[in-house]
From Swiss-Prot:
Free-text cofactor note: Binds 1 zinc ion.
Gene that this sequence comes from: HIS4
Keyword terms, alphabetized: Amino-acid biosynthesis, ATP-binding, Histidine biosynthesis, Hydrolase, Metal-binding, Multifunctional enzyme, NAD, Nucleotide-binding, Oxidoreductase, Zinc
Reactions catalysed: 1-(5-phospho-beta-D-ribosyl)-5'-AMP + H2O = 1-(5-phospho-beta-D-ribosyl)-5-[(5-phospho-beta-D-ribosylamino)methylideneamino]imidazole-4-carboxamide; 1-(5-phospho-beta-D-ribosyl)-ATP + H2O = 1-(5-phospho-beta-D-ribosyl)-5'-AMP + diphosphate + H(+); L-histidinol + 2 NAD(+) + H2O = L-histidine + 2 NADH + 3 H(+)
Descriptive protein name: Histidine biosynthesis trifunctional protein
Pathway: Amino-acid biosynthesis; L-histidine biosynthesis; L-histidine from 5-phospho-alpha-D-ribose 1-diphosphate: step 2/9; Amino-acid biosynthesis; L-histidine biosynthesis; L-histidine from 5-phospho-alpha-D-ribose 1-diphosphate: step 3/9; Amino-acid biosynthesis; L-histidine biosynthesis; L-histidine from 5-phospho-alpha-D-ribose 1-diphosphate: step 9/9
Keyword Protein transport belongs to the record: no
Region annotation Histidinol dehydrogenase: where it falls in the sequence: 358-842
């Protein structure tokens, strides 16, 4: 509840600043004073009210409506109007905040919660009853009321409207001074059940942050109002002038009381070390949230060390503006509750930096919010043209996948389908590359510029875990690698097979004498520092760690760095750590996504910079890999682009339906954007039905059935007549995994584009994923037309050399000079010419 008094002024020019602690004022309405009234309202913390005192003609009514709209929309709190005029205004201005000035016999016709102003001469019992137990605000007005009338009215819960010239903040008045002490009006509204007669008093700052709890008395309150400072009642020492000895003084901004009138709130401006005797701002502990951030930024504005990020923001207007726009864009893109909260906090930080830079306080921001809430008319609210984009034509929405019902692939008979239908069936789920790049770029830039700090923040944001360090260094603790014996044996066997296959790929040095005296060579050298990305996502994939780590070790890479997102408790899956130990990894970056890729590409304080990055991942990982590869400052290459996992199975009537379906589902469970394709060669409807039944029956038994259901919804069975037709379509599709469950395996020779081929009924794709020895890091999304899967050579680069003897120069020298002359490169020609001249060859 506010101070129980409404001072009335003849104009804003007569405002008495000593009465500002009352917190409100009322001024007369005058059309020619509208500008001054609005200007005053926008410059003060007071609740400003307006009183329309004179009658209004019909000609003046429309002008009044227009002016009241301006007043409301610029922060005027309430308008006092005669009953009839008020009712007309409310009809014209929905939401108009009015105080009905009326006589007591008219009050019953008004809404029970409508604010009213009635004469002091009304019976006090009636006035008190009009408050409806506190749900209605009742004002009383008179030019002739006496102090005893005012105090008794206030004691009944009524707010008097008093000419400000009759009010004073003094309380020891001579008999000839006919003014009302503001303190007596306040005291009349207070009650206490304490034996000592004191009033519990909460002290708060202008932002409503509690500083401490004290006591006030009938002596301290008048003195506080007179001095406009924090004066309280000490139970041992009498009046307590806050800060009189410590220097931590208080300017009294306002006094409020609670709904029962037995507790006060002093709103103050605190100076010095703070309110608390422990030299803290508050007795209730440190501030948090926006207030704490504001205090820190105002301190940094004066004291930030050179080179600090906040100092950069204060000094670099372009950087600060760019960060505000960047964070606003990220907030607009955020979808989850956690991401929205995170991005909003970032935006608040940079916005508060700008406020602090230009001397704008949170109180001023909140004042503007409060004023906006008082508007009764609204703008249309459209964004400015520069912030809107022409709406693209509505794309056909993907069909909604039912959460129940039969799980089955779409079916197409190639002999009856159009070429467009076939093309659509083989089209992968759309990857919105441009949008993904826009999301990834700020992440990559953040890590590049801010290193470990950004990496830790992004891990907290995306993985939900706060880490002290982003790196787990080798040697890795034994307790982090504890595995069941069967799992350890499986990993060891898989590592051994992958090692054997990749060691066999090591190439001998190639040496060719192209003509007498000219020997050309090619030899392999390992890439020195490699970064291996091990995905997390919907499934933990420790197998990827061995598929990347073993070839890196075989190739002889000197520095192997793993990166994998941590679990919610900050740890990694022990299988990944065990493999890292087995392949001699230097460290494991505890991060996933684009931030992990950026850390390995550019290096941070703790993450070594890598020369090449390997490994599959989601669309954000792929976008980050492609982004850093195209940044010449990163000097970092990648193994290949990657997309969602996929399989194409070619099966004939001799294939076991259960085998076929198990291969399809083993890829479908990777993710909802995975795709599986079945090319059914010369199958009857009955044979196809057996496969369809097996799809549903096996799928519903899987723990990841909901992922499978959504993947199968955009996957297809295509019926073809011949093996040749199936292989042609497979080469067109260029699958990551190609499985041939056909009677005659000789068709392998016709495979032109595939990441890896699995031949025969007993070669499930799962074997290649784990233990057969081939690598499971393969090109997806059709990139098998241009890229190989990861192999030993992927971790090497090949250097050529040539050794030319005088005899060799005799054979090729003239040809070199002639070609250099054709290209106009005389220095090239001369490098051969001077040698041949000294040899006497020309």
């Amino acid at each position: 509840m506010t101070f129980p008094l409404l001072p009335a002024y003849a104009s804003v020019a007569e405002f008495d600043n000593s009465l500002s602690l009352v917190g409100k004022a009322v001024f007369p309405y005058a059309a020619d004073q509208l500008h001054n009234l609005i200007k005053f309202t926008q410059s003060t913390e007071l609740q400003v009210n307006v009183q329309v005192e004179s009658s209004v003609t019909e000609d003046q009514f429309e002008e009044l409506i227009d002016n009241l709209l301006k007043l409301y929309n610029n922060g005027i709190n309430e308008v006092i109007l005669d009953l009839d005029l008020a009712e007309r205004v409310v009809q014209r201005i929905p939401g108009a905040r009015v105080i009905y000035r009326t006589l007591v016999d008219k009050v019953a016709s008004l809404p029970a919660n409508a604010s009213i102003a009635v004469p002091f001469s009304s019976p006090l019992g009636d006035l008190k009853s009009f408050t409806n137990g506190g749900s209605r605000t009742v004002y009383a007005f008179s030019e002739t009321a006496k102090l005893v009338d005012v105090t008794s009215t206030v004691a009944s819960g009524i707010i008097p409207i008093i000419d400000a010239r009759q009010l004073t903040t003094e309380y020891e008045l001579s008999e000839d001074v006919k003014k009302f002490p503001v303190s007596e009006i306040l005291l009349a509204s207070l009650t206490t059940d304490r034996p000592d007669g004191l009033f519990t008093t909460l002290v708060a700052d202008s932002s409503n942050y509690s500083l401490g709890l004290v006591y006030s008395s009938k002596k301290s309150i008048p003195e506080a109002i007179r001095t406009q400072t924090g004066v309280y009642q000490s139970r041992r020492h009498g009046l307590w002038y806050k800060g009189a000895t410590s220097g931590a003084t208080q300017k009294l901004l306002g006094i409020e009381l609670d709904c029962d009138g037995d507790c006060l709130k002093f709103v103050v401006e605190q100076t010095g070390v703070g309110f608390c005797h422990l030299e803290r701002t508050s007795c209730f502990g440190q501030s948090k949230g926006l207030r704490a951030m504001e205090a820190t930024l105002w301190d940094r504005k004066s004291n930030a060390p050179e080179g600090s990020y906040t100092k950069r923001l204060f000094d670099d207007e372009v950087l600060l503006n760019a960060k505000i726009r960047e964070e606003a864009d990220e907030l607009a893109e955020a979808k989850s509750k956690e991401d929205i909260a995170w991005e909003c906090a970032d935006l608040f930080y940079f916005a508060l930096v700008r406020c602090a830079k230009y001397g704008v306080t949170l109180d001023e921001v909140e004042r503007n919010l409060d004023m906006k809430s008082l508007k009764v008319t609204r703008r249309k609210g459209d964004a400015k043209p520069g912030y809107t984009k022409e709406q693209p034509k509505e794309e056909s929405k993907p069909k909604e996948v039912p959460s129940e019902g039969r799980i089955e692939l779409c079916k197409i008979d190639v002999s009856k389908a159009s070429s467009q239908e076939i093309e659509d069936a083989l089209r992968r789920p759309i990857q919105k590359t441009e949008q993904i790049m826009e999301l990834v770029k700020p992440i990559v830039d953040n890590v590049r510029q801010n290193g470990d700090k950004a990496l830790l923040e992004l891990t907290a944001k995306f993985d939900g875990v706060a880490l002290k360090t982003p790196v787990l260094e080798a040697p890795f603790p034994e307790e982090l690698m504890q595995l069941p014996d069967n799992v350890k044996r499986a990993i060891d066997l898989s590592i051994d097979n992958v090692r054997k296959f990749h060691e066999a790929q090591l190439a001998e040095t190639l040496q060719v004498e192209t003509c007498p005296g000219v020997v050309c060579s090619r030899f392999a050298r390992p890439i020195e520092k490699v970064g291996l990305y091990i995905p997390g996502g919907t499934a933990i994939l420790p197998s990827t760690s061995l598929m990347l780590g073993v070839p890196a070790k075989v190739a002889g890479c000197k520095e192997i760095v793993f990166a994998s997102p941590p679990k919610k408790d900050g740890t990694l899956t022990p299988e990944v750590i065990y493999v890292a130990h087995k392949v001699g990894a230097k460290c494991i970056v505890l991060a996933g996504g684009a931030q992990a890729v950026a850390a390995m590409a550019y290096g941070t304080e703790t993450v070594p910079k890598c020369d090449k990055i390997f490994g599959p991942g989601n669309q954000f990982v792929t976008a980050a890999k492609m982004m850093v590869q195209n940044d010449t400052s990163a000097l970092c290459s990648i193994d290949m682009p990657a997309g969602p996992s996929e399989v194409l199975v070619i099966a004939d009537k001799y294939a076991d339906p259960d085998f076929v379906v198990s291969d399809l589902l083993s890829q479908a469970e990777h993710g909802i954007d995975s795709q599986v394709i079945l090319l059914a060669v010369d199958m009857t409807d009955k044979e196809l039905a057996r496969i369809e039944d097996a799809v549903h029956n096996q799928a519903v038994q899987l723990p990841r059935v909901e992922i499978v259901r959504k993947c199968i919804a955009h996957s297809t069975t295509l019926s073809v007549a011949t093996y040749e037709q199936a292989l042609e379509m497979s080469n067109q599709y260029a699958p990551e995994h190609l499985i041939l469950q056909i009677e005659n395996a000789s068709y392998v020779d016709q495979v032109q584009h595939a990441g890896s081929v699995f031949v025969g009924a007993y070669s499930p794709e799962s074997c290649g994923d784990y233990s057969s020895g081939t690598n499971h890091t393969l090109p997806t999304y059709g990139y098998a037309r241009q890229y190989s899967g990861v192999n030993t050579a992927t971790f090497q680069k090949f250097i050529t050399s040539q050794d030319v003897t005088p005899e060799g120069l005799k054979h090729i020298g003239q040809a070199v000079m002639d070609l250099a002359a054709v290209e106009g490169l005389d220095a090239h020609r001369n490098a051969v010419k001077v040698r041949m001249e000294k040899l006497g060859l020309i």
